[in-house]
Amino acid sequence: MSSRPILDAGPGLNFLALHKERLLFSAVGPLSAPACVEEEILRKAQADSRFEAADRVWRKLSERLMSVLPDDPTAELERAVERISSLPLDERYQRRRDLGETMVVAHAAVAADRGVRMIVLIDDQWGRRLAAAEQRRLERLRSNGRPVGRIDLISTTTVLERAAGSVHLPDRASLRALYQRLRTLDDGLLPLQTTGLLDLPAWNRH
C-alpha cells in the first residue's frame, strides 16, 4: 500500500513560484503537505517577492492535486515528533525553525508504521538526515518481522530527472534555463553539472 508523497516547503516554494506546478505533478503525481508547510509556503510567498506567485498558485490547487495533512495532536503523531525531535509536539510546534521538515518526516513515519510505503520530497540536508534516520528505524523493525512500510526520499533532482524529455522539460537547454532559475530561489541546490541531470538517457531520444 502506498500514499501520496509528502512535500516540504522548499521544493514547493521553488516550483510553484516559477509556475512549474504542472512539471511537479506530472513527475510525482498528487501530493500532500503538513499544515505547517502550507503556512510556511504562504508566509514566505507573502514576505519575499521572489516567491510571490507561489501564493496564488497554491490557493488554486485542488484537493485532487494537493491535500493538507492536519498537524492536530494524535497519539501516533506525538510519538513520532518526540522520537524525531526529542521534544513534545506542542513544544516543537512553537519552534518554527525546521518545523516543516520535522512534520513531513513525522507524518510519513506515522503512515509507514501502519504499513504504508511513503515518499517524502525534501531538499534540506537536515531534513533529509531526519528522514534517513527514520528509514533505518523502519529497516530494523522489518528485520525483526514487523509489518511496517517504508519511507523513500526524493529531491528536486529526482523531480527533474523524471520530467526529463517530457513536454515540460524537452531538452538540455530547457533544463539549464530552469535549473538556473531554481538556484536563484534556493542557493542550497547543487551546481547543475554535479547532479548527473545533463547526462540522462532521455536527452538522447531528442
Predicted regions and their residues:
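Active-site-proximal, substrate-binding regions of enzyme catalytic domains
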Residues: S2-M118, Q125-H206
